[in-house]
């Protein structure tokens, strides 16, 4: 049983109501029930790909009635492509111009192709393969251009952007090791933007750890100021 039947408006709405009223039912699932991390070989020090097992078939083949289905997707963890974030105007209320420049580095295409290829090998294992009706064969595309086209048309973000306010000691670093913005008093940045590069995994837990550390730094700073003020008092 999967969430595929509940992607429609009626069944999805009923499942949502059941969850809100009773805290039970299909909507208690967050959709991605399993995952895996792996590298190019067993000696890899860091994973290069992450797989997500999604308990729903979001885009079933046309003209096919599918009662249940699941999907497994691969994610490249260390892309080399770099995007930009620029001011759109001098108006502080104006939204910034964000260009992620996905797949602008050739090596990302190579990594994505290999990630899909290795994921198919995992799917072919006896414990899982018997449940899979259809999978993508990246080698069935006869040219590099066709493989690139297929990847570009289907690739999506998983919303782990980092690095726009990176920490460091060089002149291009935005914050120092105390999370303080260089050149501006009493301003810290505490989120994923301070990471110099994206990590090989999900960003939520590291950001929570950063926030806890930042709270300690701010509290320590307040205590120091309180002591200094106290010394000045008669």
Where are these regions (language model features)?
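An alpha-helix initiation/capping motif
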Residues: 137-149
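Short acidic alpha-helical/loop segments enriched in Asp/Glu that coordinate divalent cations
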Residues: 128-140
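Mid-to-C-terminal "cap/lid" subdomains and adjacent gly/pro-rich loops that border
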Residues: 1-66, 121-126, 144, 153, ...
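C-terminal structured subdomain/cap of oxidoreductase catalytic cores
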Residues: 1-2, 41, 70-128, 148-234
């Amino acid at each position: 049983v999967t969430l595929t039947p509940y992607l429609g408006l009626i069944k999805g709405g009923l499942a949502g109501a059941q969850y809100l009223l009773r805290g039970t039912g299909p909507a208690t699932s967050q959709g991605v029930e399993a995952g895996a991390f792996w590298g190019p070989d067993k000696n890899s020090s860091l994973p290069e790909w992450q797989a997500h097992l999604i308990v729903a078939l979001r885009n079933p083949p046309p003209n096919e009635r599918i009662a249940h289905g699941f999907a497994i997707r691969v994610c490249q963890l260390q892309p080399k492509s770099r995007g930009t974030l620029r001011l759109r105007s001098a108006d502080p209320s104006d939204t910034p111009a964000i260009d992620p420049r996905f797949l602008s580095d050739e090596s990302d295409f190579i990594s994505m192709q290999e990630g899909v290829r290795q994921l198919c090998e995992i799917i072919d294992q006896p414990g899982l393969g018997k449940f899979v009706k259809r999978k993508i064969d990246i080698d069935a595309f006869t040219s590099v251009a066709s493989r690139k086209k297929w990847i570009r048309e289907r690739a999506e973000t998983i919303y782990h952007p980092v690095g726009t306010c990176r920490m460091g000691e060089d002149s291009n670093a935005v914050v120092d090791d105390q999370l303080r913005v260089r050149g501006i008093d009493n301003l810290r940045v505490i989120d994923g933007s301070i990471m110099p590069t994206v990590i090989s995994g999900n960003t939520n837990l590291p950001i929570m750890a950063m926030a806890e550390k930042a709270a300690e730094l701010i509290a320590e700073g307040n205590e120091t100021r309180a002591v200094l003020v106290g010394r000045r008092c008669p």
